[in-house]
Each structure stands twice: as structure tokens, then as C-alpha cells.
Amino acid sequence: MISTTTHSVEGHEITDYVGIVNGEAIMGANVVRDFLAGISDVIGGRSAAYEDKLAEGRQIAVREMEDRAAQLGADAVVGVMLDFETLRDGMLMCVATGTAVKLRRRS
């Protein structure tokens, strides 16, 4: 499955717009990691724990979005956007949204 933030796929023509698809991931962060991330932020370093959580959430959300597109018979998802939100109690939500399309290779 091709996923792209652009509105076209190089070397292909979009033959059908199947619909809007999305995927979500809600991740928990533990208290020790939150505390250590806070120390890292105060010192001015990067928080690897949060970066890892963001990457994991992104992968899950994109995979779920692609699975939904495949269920609709799509070849690709274009115009992909990612959104991250911090929820209460240390929860992190990642949402991937895009348009599922059918493609034909240009000759």
C-alpha cells in the first residue's frame, strides 16, 4: 500500500477516489518515563521515551489507515495527515487521515 502526504503518486494516475480513511492509536505513558522526560526537558535534552511513543503511535495509526483503505479495494492513500494530541492521565493519541484511491500506472 502506498501512503503519501502529496495529492498524487508519481508515475500513476488516480482513477477513482474511494473515500476518506483514518486510523487511530491511543497510547499510555508510564509515570517513571514521564518523570524522566520532565528532567530531560529541564536539562534541555531530548526525550527519547516520548519520541519512541510518538513513532509507535504513528506506525500503528498509519497501518490501521492503510488496512481500512485495502478493505475498500484502494491501491494507495493520498493527502495523508498526522495529528497528535495529549489526553488526560498521560495518554497520547495519534490520528492518521487520508483519501483512499485507485491507481493506474502511466505508460
UniProtKB/Swiss-Prot annotation:
Listed InterPro entries: UPF0145_dom_sf (IPR035439), UPF0145_YbjQ-like (IPR002765)
Stored Gene3D superfamilies: Hypothetical protein apc22750. Chain B
Family annotation (PANTHER family): UPF0145 PROTEIN YBJQ
Similarity comment: family membership: Belongs to the UPF0145 family.
Name of the protein this chain belongs to: UPF0145 protein BH1111
